[in-house]
Amino acid sequence: MYTVVRVGSTTLADDVSDAIVRMLTEFGVSSPGPGVRNPHFVNGELCTSSDWVLHRDAIIAFLRRWSAAGCDHIYAELDIEFDVAVYPEDRSGLLAKCLCVDNALIGELHQTHSNIMISVYNDVDENE
């Protein structure tokens, strides 16, 4: 099982994109080099979409840093099938909690946190 992190924004400014690359590099993935937009890393190798595949501990650290920077929003595909968007107004440690989700917690978060959007991905192939 692996986890995908998708960072999205309607407009991804150059400095924000560069900051993302620096953060990801700190967490042990390869730098995509200058001019590459929305880099995608699978097991440390650069791909072409706007997702990152990282180990869970790296994701927790990355999401905390991203949220603390006050960026637009975070998408974290958890255990392949759950997509959770965590907005900057919630910085109370919920990010780490979301990385340990199960079905009951998904329902609880959806009911109690209006800034959490959850959708189910059924078409993600773990072998891709």
For every predicted segment, state its role:
Residues 1-128:
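Acidic (Asp/Glu-rich) sequence patches and key acidic residues
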